[in-house]
Amino acid sequence: MLELQVIFTTKIKASVFMATAKAKKTTTKENTKTSNKKATSKTATSKKSSGSKNLIIVESPAKARTIKNFLGKDYEVIASKGHIRDLPQHRFGITIKDKHFIPTYDISKDHALLVKEMQDLHKNAEVTYIATDEDREGEAIGYHIVEALNGDISQFPRIVFHEITKSAITHSLDNPRLIDMDRVNAQQARRLLDRIVGFKLSGLLSQKIGRGLSAGRVQSSALKILVDREKEIRAFNPQDYFLIEAYFVADSKAKEEEKLVFDLVRFKDKKIEKLVLQDKKEAEEILAILQKEKFRVESIQQKERVTKSPPPFMTSTLQQTSSNLLGFSPTKTMSIAQKLYEGVKTKDGLAGVITYMRTDSLNIAKEALDNAREFILTSIGKDYLPSKAKIYTATQKGAQEAHEAIRPTNLSFTPQIAAGYLSNDELKLYTLIFNRFIASQMKDAIFESLSVSVMGELSEFKITGRRLVFDGFYKILGNADKDKLLPQFKEGQAIDFKDIQSIQKTTEPPPHYSEAGLIKTLESLGIGRPSTYAPTIRILIDRKYVELEKKQLIVQDIAFNVIAMLEANFEEIVDSGFSAALESKLDDIAENKLEWEEVLWEFYEPFIEKITKGKTSIESQKVMKPTGELCPECGNELVIRNGRYGEFVSCSNYPQCKFIKKEKQEVETSDEICEKCGRPMVVKMSKRGKFLACSGYPECKNAQPLEKPKELSVACPKCGGRLLERKSKRGIFYGCGNYPKCKFITNAEPTNEKCDKCGGMLCWHKTKENTKVCVECKNVVT
């Protein structure tokens, strides 16, 4: 198939989508193992019968419901539920020949019936619109939908919108375009690149270090950042040092609480900074001299300082701020933002209340700017409205400026009104987005800074205070910093001290990265894109490379082994500069500046040579150490092996003999009591990690997860006990905390709401968003 260069001869209408196409260059379709048709200029309506509906294909069911609510009976809206086809799950899925990359795409089993339904609807539709998300991922999903429908992109109008509102949907229908094949190629290059790295390198890691490990272009760069910080922390050598503080008062009658703490900044022409005074004796000698000095106010410096209003959110800053202020993980933030974008209940029915949430742009539509300024004028006050709208520009290369920043879609839907429609977490995130957008268009805050210098014969002390003169954007965001007010001083004024003392301090190691901190670093280095930050952190946690403890990402030992091997043999994979440069090339593909296969081959050729060489040259860390003992089952020698959870002893004749020696270990006790037999519970280890087991095993085989189940603020409908969130091999379920006395259980998330028909408990529907179902009578409530 040939890539299309579309020449629009007339304005595209919703009912007739016509385009003239010509061959431009070999592209994705030519290299895809699918059944493709040639481009055609036949209109999209020529085969339809009169009275047919228009079909709109989106990604998510929630988005489909919201759009259907706006458009009515003339439109059928169906959701693809994400990618309808992808590279095969358990095979490499890419044929590489003569510098060409030919991917094989499979339609997943759970999408097969959906594709059939889409094909049937398309056959009877007047026009079929592709309305997947506006990023590259959405562009590629739209392309694959067209392929699955055995169509040609010239026959499928592509509509995009930054927000799911009636006006935005209507505008997009009046202004369709074609699927952008450059963006599709960029996404496919990324997908194939990630498959090449992940499939080939993960296999090598499993061969050389241990099963269940993975590597990836963005994932491994992020892990290298975390490992480097962990090395800094472990190598850190704390140092003691001394600071000298003087407690001065403006006049001798000042109260105790009015003492002002001044810092020693100079002594005998020596600048006193952190780590300058490391000797306790020297600090005490200086202290003795200072206590005999007379002091006066040498200078007073007063300055006006401006704190600029923050820009509206893009994906990375939303994730960082949500993590810091709300305690939400990046995954949770994006999940809630997705719901707010796709549609929630409002007084006017279903509507998207924020713009698209995967964006690296700071652009704001003119209409939205005008609305924000009107809101500030009428709801906050004219003193807070700047003379003109503030325009922000993203600094990173590749930022898609055609998109918008994240903002509310309707400023009349204030957080106060939204409280009646949104859940607690949805309201928290919506309020954060709403207030940040309004703040971005408000005046800057103004502070008055006051610096006072006090001199002795040999010394100089300083203190700095500040006072908020005009709150500006803090009016809506709030200001957590309290004013540090200083009393009135006069230059030359004699001043007394109440006390002078040396304070011993100790340097601290750099902190572990938080999720927000890692995202900020990845963004600053140009690693990854808005859609990759949350999944990258999630996979590092899932692979047990890091653990999240008290909001900090703690690197595990296995990560050091993985990074050491990658640094020694695949340095470019963990090199942040290389990863950022590759990201930049993907941007160039999307802008038609580079050929996608050339970029892939440039990476693939040297990479696959290293993989081939590494299979024989890289020393395995699965070294088997002899124990001198014999296997009790087959008589071969027992050896020490490295596993994911440390060393263990097994038969050297594995896999023919699968004997594993159970080492006698000190029993790790717990405070838990077995509810079945009353014996104490102990901590044991399985291949999935630690768990609680009854000390009476094998007589009592009771076992529980080590982590306490999450307690819900929902009462059991059977006995009134508290419901708990538990996990099984089949997934999450909810059971009564009074088990086994009460055996109430449900697979759907419970709520405190009651069924208006029978009074039973309402639970969230497992597949239908914004829908609840009664556990007793199965009544469905939307």
Q: Where are the model-predicted features located?
A:
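Intrinsically disordered, low-complexity regulatory segments
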Residues: 1, 8-13, 17-191, 200, ...
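Short acidic, hydrophobic short linear motifs in intrinsically disordered regions
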Residues: 309-322, 348-356, 509-521
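Short, hydrophobic-biased segments on the C-terminal half of alpha helices
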Residues: 334-338, 537-538
